[in-house]
Structures are given as structure tokens and as C-alpha cells.
């Protein structure tokens, strides 16, 4: 644990391509140079109609519980989201429930390419009472609550990528 008691939780809500179920029922992660077991032992939630039911079973229920506890902490939190399209109501409901609590200090930072439009739930949240705590870094620019998009003066505007965010954190951003 860092000296300042800050921590980061990396929560893979739908599993990972490097998670496998061993014969004893434990989930383990394949590391570099490990031999990959059979693909049918992979622990993933695939995009299908039974996705919600699968999230109610371990190891996913444990991940979801950690997600819920992290969101509902009374401490200042940053929920940084990448690789998620905001298409799962059960996840969106948890985020919205946490953000809507008056005592909640969580800030949502969503990294989205979204070439067409911002997902409907994010559009709704931007206009809500907690909208100032909803930040969207997208191909169209940076949105902070109802404001935006703000674009950087640079020709190559790539906020929504790890490289772009790292650049902004390191060099600041001129809009």
C-alpha cells in the first residue's frame, strides 16, 4: 500500500482472456511463458443474453462486489473506465446509483472513442445533478458535465487513449 494510503483497483467485470479455471475449481491467471490450458477452461463472460446471470456467479460476483464497494466509498474516488461501451444496464445502474448519492465523491472518467455519439446513459448523467463529476475523454474532445467538447489545439487530438491521457497529465492541456 502506498504511503499516502491511495490505491487503485483494476476490476475486470467480465473476466479476462488470461483467466482460466483449474481442475480444483480455482481461477488462475496465465502469465508470460506459462502453457495455456484448453480454451474451454477460460473464465470470461461473452456478449450473449445470459451475461447478467453469469455476473451473479464467482469469480464475477466477487468482482462486482468489489466494484460496488469501490463506487460507494465515502472517500474521493476516480472511476476510470476504458474498453467499456456503457451497454450493460446492471453495470450502468450501479454507477448511476453511486454517483447520485449526495455524499458520494466519485468522479467518472470515461475514455471513449465513440465515433458516432456518446452513449445515452452518459448523455443523461452529464445533465444530472452529479454531472460535474462526469468527464468524458473522446475522439470529439473532452466533456466535463454539460460543457464541451473541448478540443486541444494540437492537430492530433487523442485524449481518449492512454498515450493522450499520459501526455495531458505530463504536459497539461491547452484548449
Task: Label the predicted regions.
Residues 51, 59-64:
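Active-site-proximal segments of catalytic enzyme domains
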Residues 1-45, 55:
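Extended, H/D-rich, highly charged conserved domains that either
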Residues 53-54, 65-175:
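SIR2/sirtuin-family catalytic core signature
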Amino acid at each position: 500500500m502506498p504511503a499516502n494510503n491511495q490505491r487503485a483497483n483494476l476490476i475486470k467485470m467480465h473476466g479476462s482472456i488470461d483467466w482460466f479455471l483449474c481442475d480444483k475449481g480455482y481461477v488462475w491467471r496465465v502469465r508470460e511463458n506459462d502453457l495455456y490450458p484448453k480454451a474451454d477452461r477460460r473464465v470470461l463472460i461473452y456478449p450473449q443474453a445470459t451475461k447478467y446471470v453469469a455476473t451473479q456467479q464467482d469469480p464475477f460476483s466477487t468482482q462486482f462486489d468489489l466494484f460496488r464497494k469501490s463506487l460507494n466509498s465515502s472517500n474521493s474516488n476516480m472511476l476510470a473506465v476504458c474498453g467499456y461501451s456503457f451497454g450493460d444496464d446492471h453495470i450502468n445502474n450501479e454507477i448511476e446509483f453511486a454517483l447520485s448519492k449526495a455524499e458520494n465523491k466519485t468522479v467518472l472518467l470515461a475514455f471513449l472513442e465513440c465515433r458516432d455519439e456518446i452513449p445515452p446513459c452518459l448523455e443523461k448523467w452529464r445533465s444530472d445533478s452529479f454531472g460535474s463529476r462526469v468527464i468524458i475523454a473522446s475522439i470529439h474532445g473532452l466533456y466535463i458535465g454539460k460543457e464541451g467538447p473541448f478540443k486541444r489545439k494540437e492537430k492530433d487530438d487523442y485524449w481518449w487513449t492512454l498515450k493522450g491521457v499520459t501526455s495531458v497529465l505530463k504536459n497539461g492541456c491547452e484548449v
